[in-house]
Amino acid sequence: MKYFVAIIFAIIGLALPLELDAQNKELMRGYEKDLNSLFEQVFSTENKENERYNANEEVMVIMEEALLQRDSYKWKWKLRKGVSVLTSDDDKFRVITWAVVNDNNEFECFGYMQVLNENADVYEVCRLQDKTADIFNPGEVALTDQNWFGCIYTDLITTKYDGRYYYTLLGWNGGNMTTQHRVIEPVYFKRNS
């Protein structure tokens, strides 16, 4: 009977929603408030290009600091419109993306991924580096976080087949005044050896 009760408590414990402790909640609320304030500057058409990019540099620093916090993956971000936050159905990764528009109406995309390292049982943070201008045939190239066809992701589809999860990201890149790109991107993660 003791084993049965212990198993029930273990199962109930696994089913409870993951939450941050009070101290981490307060810390993450502070990051969220700071990020939303900075995103207002990043997306403001009244700001000059250099002001938007300077604010975005601050966003990058704060975002990375926030994502590197212990248990930050549990935080449910409420970021302003224009910032996409998508999480896979199996909770293996999350992607956060946004764009800065320059004075020529060209989009430069930015983003981060939090990916579960199952061996270490921690989420690793990857900064996505927009190399759209250098990628001439995106459909023929294997892309990485260091060589990313930048976009704002609008949907993350999780598919399970033969016991393994597969992911498809759908996105949009504003390009410039004459072009826009719709992006369909299959995603997989290599296991670190």
Task: Give residue ranges: language-model regions.
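Bacterial Sec-dependent N-terminal signal peptides
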Residues: 1-34
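Start-of-domain marker
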Residues: 23-95
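Structural signature of eukaryotic scaffold interfaces centered on beta-propeller domains
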Residues: 79-92, 148-163
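Short beta-strand elements that form the blades of beta-propeller/WD-repeat-like
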Residues: 92-99, 165-173
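Short consensus segments that form the blades of beta-propeller domains
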Residues: 101-107, 145-146, 174-179
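Beta-propeller blade signature
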Residues: 109-118, 183-191
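Short N-terminal edge-element motif at the start of the domain
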Residues: 112-158
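Short helix-loop boundary/capping segments
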Residues: 171-193
